[in-house]
């Protein structure tokens, strides 16, 4: 069963809900080899053992994405006619110890729920997609 934790992303409540979880944003790191994986595992162990909250690193580009997210969500709704609900963190009882912070969820007419991930690439990156004639995966 999926549980939606409605705390806004970045809030203390959201950070608390994520503590000790392997999240979608760090899953690739968990599967990798080397020091970045070791650092992630130590961070998660500290969260579980001592409740050590790590707010992580946020680059200027990441902050820009956060700042543009609400506008991007509105544009998506205007372009598609689909309603998007904001969510904080999703966990699934079938996958204990894991979670995902979605940028929104969309309820389909068929009754299923689909996650929305918003990306706000920098102008140079966007120009590259246009020049290459491709949509990023």
List the model feature ranges, each with a label:
Residues 1-67:
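Charged, glycine-rich intrinsically disordered N-terminal tails and low-complexity linkers that flank
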Residues 55, 60-63, 67-137:
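Mg2+/Mn2+-dependent nuclease catalytic core
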